[in-house]
Amino acid sequence: MAEEGQVIGVHTVDAWNEHLQKGIDDKKLIVVDFTASWCGPCKFIASFYAELAKKMPTVTFLKVDVDELKSVATDWAVEAMPTFMFLKEGKIVDKVVGAKKDELQQTIAKHISSTSTA
């Protein structure tokens, strides 16, 4: 497992399921960056996404390469990159499509404030 404050690269379906289950068990907000190695905007926002992970250690930040995990991208209906999915207790609570720094940060903040701490 990665340390808090890091973006966790998910490379297998088993790892994906494990992280989802951990998020459900811990009642943590999970933000998933669906990305691709050939996607320019994905590269543009990657360092910003990593900065957010450092600033918000209570949130789990995952990164999924859609070419590496096609089945996961298909299951979650990802049609454009980057797509950021916000999950709580295994359900999608929000989504940001595109390299939109402000919208990404605001959406995370909105869902952190609505998460009750145990």
From Swiss-Prot:
Alphabetized Pfam families for the sequence: Thioredoxin
Disulfide bonds: 39-42
Record CDD domains: TRX_family
Keywords from the UniProt entry: Cytoplasm, Disulfide bond, Electron transport, Redox-active center, Transport
Main localization category: cytoplasm
Record carries keyword Nucleotidyltransferase: no
Compartments where located: Cytoplasm
InterPro entries in alphabetical order: Thioredoxin-like_sf, Thioredoxin_CS, Thioredoxin_domain, Thioredoxin_H-type-like
Name of the protein described by the UniProt record: Thioredoxin H-type 2
Protein family per UniProt: Belongs to the thioredoxin family. Plant H-type subfamily.
Active-site positions on this chain: 39 (nucleophile), 42 (nucleophile)
Domain Thioredoxin: start-end pairs: 2-113
Gene3D superfamilies found in the cross-reference section: Glutaredoxin
Protein's job: Participates in various redox reactions through the reversible oxidation of the active center dithiol to a disulfide. The H form is known to activate a number of cytosolic enzymes.
Site positions (Deprotonates C-terminal active site Cys): 33
Annotated positions for site Contributes to redox potential value: 40-41
Keyword rRNA-binding among UniProt keywords: no
GO cellular component, one term: cytoplasm
